[in-house]
């Protein structure tokens, strides 16, 4: 969503995401409840505590993440992840966040339906998502659009995958 400063780009996104945020809050409350039960069972060393699995928080949205975190969160929620950046250029700046970060290439691969795999995070097992579903939404100011018009985004086809919405002024 593109518009001048103060045009009101953020409120429509907040309204659209309200049901998702409410759902995510319910997931968080459920996770906290299950974690309390798990920790209580482990603390008392109940007979069934060894069979209990530590609960995992399912997330629906991300706003600040590494590539490894994106794969992990998507692995924990195979239904999909939405990336919501109020200022979309913040996400795109993160494509260079850690030097030779393959974030941009991975986002292009996700768009093409390629699997995601994470073997570098220190977990008991690697994470793999066969059919990723990652949606990206955000806003920017009209004058900042030129920051998207650079070879890094144009030559890779990244810009071709963006739907730009520019509402008419009142």
Residue ranges and their predicted role:
Residues 1-170:
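Phosphate-handling catalytic cores of nucleic-acid transaction enzymes
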